[in-house]
């Protein structure tokens, strides 16, 4: 019996790895004693002891340790420790564990420490999906998961910047990445909605509606994206834009560990607008006035000594029945401008306890985070480009009476105290009862809270106060969000022969509450009060009105959900799900929606032709169909609302506020649906060295919600919200991972992520509601040239609309093609009309997104190099339109006004002359790390690293940076002027485990 047990240990280690936590310490010692006893007659050499840990320094429990070429081996205990008796000199130890790459080491002395690296191509990896988990190889839908070890290194503002470029089909838009108070916009597989939002649902540790700012980057274990409709349909009304599942780190059974993960950082300005210096300004600009100073306004706004640091300390561990993890975090970062700053303090904890002979599991999560923000005004950077560079940096009087078109950009920031205090909290409790080995039920109750208090005080020396003739202006705003979640699930699994079936059913209730209050006053006796004594101001007292407002709203959803997973002999797999959901936002006749989904996969690699293949390890073809919904529009728009109609003065009653019908109700307003189709292939080749996926998808938006004009009467208002439009998105995605070189001392792996996406508005109208087109936001003054984008039936999202450039006349005035017909008649751009406008070539949506990651390891060093880029899209460059022409009514200008654009002497016109290629390729991240071998019992793992972000960018775009331009939503590709500087970031970090 002992002999068979030892053989099982060596040859069936995968089984024992799973069973290892169940063994007691005595059983493990017995195993080692028995194994060495049977082999003692063969090996009479020395005893080797050691520890096996993962890359974070945590012990690996149940790892196989064997002398290569023999059956002499053992497994690690709860602390990751092992002892091998009778180990010959120069023996090679093979260390393996499921999910990790096998390591071979030659002990130096009688003690050894082995660090296992995770296997990125591991097919047995467990991936979190909606309301459950799945083995990676059994997925039937388009799901991509990124583990923390594969995150981009360095400083980030939010979690999605860790995986920017890591997931095909996911666009992370960080237009002001160096502003510590900014966050990213996220889009999955294109934009499809006009009014109900295009952002994905965020789920943190199973809690839908999570906030990515309420989590430290060091606490995240993985980020998983559910991309196709079948994967996301289980979330119903909020799954149409994809679902992002964030899983935080958990404790492990074994020795309690303490870890520290921190870094310091500094930002450098990567690129500045090329404006005229004072001498060039005086020499070139007609009517230029020299005020005697030489001021680089843009440079004056830059905080050259900015500094940031981030510290995270975690305590984790547990026993066979209880695991826990507690972490605390402090983060502070100064922005690239002279006023912005952010301080964050966070606490997060989780636990799980198993009792009653593994029948009862209880667990929970708790987190609290507070962020203190000092905010900036991006408009100052626009002003810094256009302002006379010969003014003093303290000048104020010269700008009085300018109507806000000209002002001192430095004083605009320093003479204003603007910020916010934000509190994030989350708590949930989970209880799971394992009724039978294959039947369980679980209950989750959770609460998420977010409180935000904004304050904005403009000192008496602020430009607005000077022009208005009052002493100070104070404004405060308080917002509170409270979400409650109650969910019940039941799971049943059974196997009959080669048929495995899993059934899940559940109920979900969510309640979303929002409250807002704001107040303002001005003309204070002193600036010392700031926003702390609004009653001291006298402006609102003069006419008896209160300068305050408040609002409150609520939304509720109820859902019944179910899912079936079927697996026939790992050859055929099927998943079907259904969610029936009700939402209070919709009309009385359409409050409930049904969201079905189905997906299937065929493991082609199990065919006889592949049985002896040395190339194909796993090959799977899958197809999915799913219906999801959207509910991201304003609450109560289906109902008749009364709203304020302004203030009216009565000699008898004083000021009276009027109320009346605020909208046209639509009791038939229903669900905006998205129907998704996905065809995919998952592959693992060449002994797991090459792996990845290929997906083709179509997403059709139906009953898209929009605002439509209606006649007066019978309607009281000009517009009504209705389900009319249709949209479509199409594309493909490729992910490929290749372990190119694997030797004892050196490894090289590379991965490519490629996606192609197009989105189109198919139809606006039906027989009842008609809408010819909608225009994007108009361009600002001076000039008010109108909008550069238009959507109508059949046009791609992000289409540009304007005049076709035909050169200039003898006076340098811009000419356009009449009727937009190139080669025909030309006319002055200033005389152009609607009949001369056409759709211009290209859209503001990148069709192609590409990233290329490379990871090298040599002994104790690791190096990662990451490129990413976006291609085949255009940017309407407002910088060139407003500051790159000689006649523009601003003081200073870009050098291009007298160089590339010197031939243009007339005013700006929205035409394709200013429509530029937005393509770029960026060396986005280089990280060099060192993990020294330490012969100490106090430190289990130490890693030092340095990261540089935004190393260089290759682009033809002449604006500040193509990444500052929004490429998500309905109106992408407008290169605005309120642009925050882009940074080149340098980070030094330390990761220690004790």
Located regions from the model:
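Acidic, glycine-rich flexible loop segments
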Residues: 380-409
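Extracellular/periplasmic, surface-exposed regions of secreted and cell-surface proteins
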Residues: 151, 199, 205, 282, ...
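Aromatic-residue-lined binding/catalytic grooves and analogous aromatic/hydrophobic interfacial grooves
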Residues: 208, 852, 992
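Detector for glycine-centered tight turns/loop "hinges" at secondary-structure junctions
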Residues: 57, 80, 206, 395-397, ...
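Surface-exposed, extracytoplasmic segments of Gram-negative outer-membrane nutrient-acquisition systems
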Residues: 648-662, 700-724, 758-845, 853, ...
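Short, small/polar-rich motifs associated with maturation and membrane association
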Residues: 1-356, 360-365, 369, 426, ...
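Extracellular/lumenal ectodomain signal focusing on beta-strand-rich modules
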Residues: 62, 86, 125, 145, ...
